[in-house]
Amino acid sequence: MTHQGIGCLVKWLYLVLIVHTLLCIGQLECRQQHHNRNNNNNNRRADSSSSEEGHGNTSDGLDNFADQDASFVGHGHQPRRGQRKKQQGGGGGGSGGGGGNGGGGGSRHNRNEESGISLWINEQQLKMLTALYFPQGYSERLYAIHNSRVTNDLRDTTLYNFLVIPSEVNYVNFTWKSGRRKYFYDFDRLQTMDESILKAPTLSIRKSGRIPQEQKNFSIFLPCTGNSSGTASFNVGLKIQTRHNKPLSGTPIRLNFKKECAHRGVYDIDASNPTSLTTLQECSLKCGKNGYCNEHHICKCNVGYTGQYCETAFCFPQCLNGGNCTAPSVCTCPEGYQGTQCEGGICKDKCLNGGKCIQKDKCQCSKGYYGLRCEYSKCVIPCKNEGRCIGNNLCRCPNGLRGDHCEIGRKQRSICKCRNGTCVSHKHCKCHPGFYGRHCNGRKRRHVHRNDDSKF
């Protein structure tokens, strides 16, 4: 064999050796991957079994997940791979609720908590009820149910003894929402404890029905008889059930309140009894012009006044910014403020670009503007075609226009044809007083009251 033939043979042997080595390395990698896969499966089984044990201790937050896995765990079967993945997400959420390590289920439980059923007294109503006890009113919510849990806020005996609904207030506003689940209500008790002073409470809604999912208001009206003066207690009972007729835990709710009523009649004075006359005269002097003295020698205040001797005027809404209530619903504002509630300031120079005067010579600017008078825009390049600056170089464009500065497109022509009004949107009219209709072309008739004496 020649030297050239030997060289070719050596090259072929070298190539065969390289191929064989690569095949061996590939087999080793396959075995290692198979070994790792087995270890992962074992770990996954262990995790799924532990998540099943942890899942057994959870309650309503993971009801759907428990129903799906009960048939597998209860019969001793190992969950399938797809269900093991479900357990790792859902079961981990259960443990996450306790230790903060889990994922999906725990966050779902939190979302359910945030969207649970709630019932509370309207903040504006609570300000009015507590205005006599707190100078600025009590502005926090007072819950009867908060996130599906019945609270004791409205059932507190201290509140019952402390809070008396004044004679000027004839209703109590409540706000409620059911959230994601369906709940049904039934007012099974609307009762007065003294029918001579207060009639039975009535509702602005049906006595029973479904609680709205979104936030809604309803009122409980408190009609005084008008025949007697005094303070009467009344009770409100409320049952709440799920769509499966299961009562909400903590219900029925029993709420007790007190309502003051004032008789507006005139009492007779026994002139034959000098002592009685003197006492009544003294009582009348104390009550002043804002009230009158009843047969029990107690001042009963006219509408809009309160206090032991009817010396305090009652303003609702409250006077703001340090204003004083000097007469029923009349606020005397301090220097620099104006408005029925002293809610607005007095600015020597007008606030520009939609700004609002909130204090003496101080403007509250709209979005996208700043300065003492809101005269400066945050848009370096002004918005065109009646666009409005709402942020740093950010314009809000009218319909039909677009672009960074509302420079692209054509403004839509308004189809609003108001004859006796002004356009408030693309196709809606706001009619002047005395007119109505889509285009404000209808005139309201004026009712003229004729005096019968004019015949003669």
Swiss-Prot record:
One Gene Ontology biological process: synaptic target recognition
Function description: Required for normal accumulation and movement of lipid-modified hedgehog (hh) morphogen. May act by stabilizing the interaction between heparan sulfate proteoglycans (HSPGs) and hh, HSPGs being required for diffusion of hh morphogen. Not involved in wingless (wg) morphogen movement, suggesting that it may provide HSPG specificity for Hh.
Compositional bias per record (Basic and acidic residues), positions renumbered to this chain: 44-55
Keyword Zinc-finger: no
Residues in coiled coil: none
Entry protein name: Protein shifted
Gene giving rise to this polypeptide: shf
The keyword Repeat appears for this protein: yes
Lineage: Eukaryota, Metazoa, Ecdysozoa, Arthropoda, Hexapoda
Disordered: region residues: 34-112
Biased composition (Gly residues): 88-107
